[in-house]
Amino acid sequence: MKAICTKLACFLLVLLVSGVAMAESITSPNGQLQLNFSVNAQGEPVYELSYKGKPVINPSKLGLELKNDPGLMNGFTMEDAKTSTFDETWEPVWGEVKQIRNHYNELAVTLNQKAQDRNIIIRFRLFDDGMGFRYEFPLQKNLNYFVIKEERTQFAMTGDHTAFWIPGDYDTQEYDYTESKLSEIRGLMKGAITPNSSQTPFSPTGVQTSLQMKTADGLYINLHEAALVDYSCMHLNLDDKNFVFESWLTPDAVGDKGYLQAPCTSPWRTVIVSDDARDILASKITLNLNEPCAYEDVSWIKPVKYVGVWWEMIAGKSTWAYTDDLPSIKLGEVDYSKMKPNGRHGATNENVKKYIDFAAEHGLDQVLVEGWNEGWEDWFGKSKDYVFDFVTPYPDFDVKMLNEYAKSKGVKLMMHHETSGSVRNYERHMDKAYQFMVDNGYNAVKSGYVGNMIPRGEHHYGQWLNNHYLYAVKKAADYKICVNAHEAVRPTGLCRTYPNLIGNESARGTEYEAFGGSKPFHTTLLPFNRLIGGPMDYTPGIFDTKLDFMGDLPHGQVQTTLAKQLALYVTLYSPLQMAADLVENYEKHMDAFQFIKDVAVDWDDS
């Protein structure tokens, strides 16, 4: 007993000498990860993480800076600390495996800020392959409505790691990845920022999550977030002298970074770590930190393999627009039946029937048709509010006839809702647009958010837009519609809770192969970065790599091979897989196309 008391006294003495007032620690279920949490002498919450005895995250501060209120950053004492263990196995509606184990040890620390009489909870969950933590704000008198000026979560790295990164940006993830040391990011940033339809880079050392790194001693570390709900998307800003990342939230039109009302929580901040790179790919931390499925009936949610009227527009053979006669249009005032067709419109009855016939013959589920609705003549770059109504087709696209024709062949059409960034307009028309889909036999929609946002000044990854994306998914579920969102915020595992979110783009996809290409290693990095948050609708399957016969593109060669295009169906998982090329190009290579027909979109194990 005397020896135990002596050890305890020594431990307390060490804490006092180091300036640490209070401390707690937990380990992962397999004991390989250890989290240490403390409140230092200034009342600042601090955490650190180790793996197999190696430091992964050096001591890092936690907190939030508030607007017009004292911050939640210091002056805290530890009021309570509770530990618990959780272990379950659940089945996803679709995915790479049939069952997922959700096993973690938890530490929930209640902190009291005496000067303001406010409490917050920081909740940590340690899994065998990493950690998640979040801020929780209980209902209380002195912390009710508050505005975030900045979240000050730190991730202090242990050295100048190799990172695989894209520039931090409030409006796009469609950049090529750069491989460099952390210390080299600043010097490489300018060259890494390439033109996009909407972009707002924010810092010479700002990067996006999911961020994959490798240490000199062989550890693989991934930083991301999970369950992004009613909050701004998190980027990371690097102090490149000390190798400390700090969270950097996406602002709104007036510069604020989040409007919260207690009780509420932040998203989870995630750290996946292993000495085996394969464990990063196999990790289910992002999904496990999301809530279970919100729907009782999921029988209507099905994985989809599809073709579509899309690549021929991307590659310049066809157009989204019906006519070239109009420099600008106002919906409801233009009589398209009196306009001269441009002869290159892709979404025609004849062309769509060709895709339907091909899909039916080869067992594909759906046919995407872009450019079917009025408004494409001046859809981009004009900051138009009322840009589409989502229900009025061009004269050469017979909605009822084509859907009946598809149904007779055992195929469905996939709807396309391009918003051109006019989110306010989309929400005004959303119920009508979804009902139009149901009335005409559609059960899936590809939505797009190309260009700058309306309301003007908002960003693609701000709190307002993140709430919109989720609103669209939940509203779609009311109509039993699945959503494939392009140009939206990168996924954070919400497909577990809302499995009708069946697809996302949110990265540099196949379309860039027609615009000069991506770096050769781009698709090898996507599984370690972008796909950590959820599946990607990469739209692979380009067989004919010569594009010069299709239009006037400056780059007439797709930088790929047939073998690579087939491999992408396995390496870039998605329950929504497109065979993106023209049907006539597949008909030349039916031996290779057999692989696309056979490859699964829903796996029991992989």
Where in this protein do the model-derived segments appear?
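Bacterial N-terminal signal peptides that target proteins for export
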Residues: 1-9
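Bacterial N-terminal signal peptides
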Residues: 9-19
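N-terminal accessory beta-strand-rich subdomains and adjacent acidic, glycine-rich linkers
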Residues: 25-296
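Glycan-recognition and catalytic regions of carbohydrate-active enzymes
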Residues: 109, 581-606
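Conserved, mostly hydrophobic/aromatic
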Residues: 135, 359, 483, 571
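An acidic-aromatic substrate-binding cleft motif
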Residues: 261-356, 362, 366
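Aromatic- and carboxylate-enriched substrate-binding clefts and catalytic-loop regions
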Residues: 370-557, 561
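Catalytic domains of carbohydrate-active enzymes that cleave complex glycans
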Residues: 555, 565-577
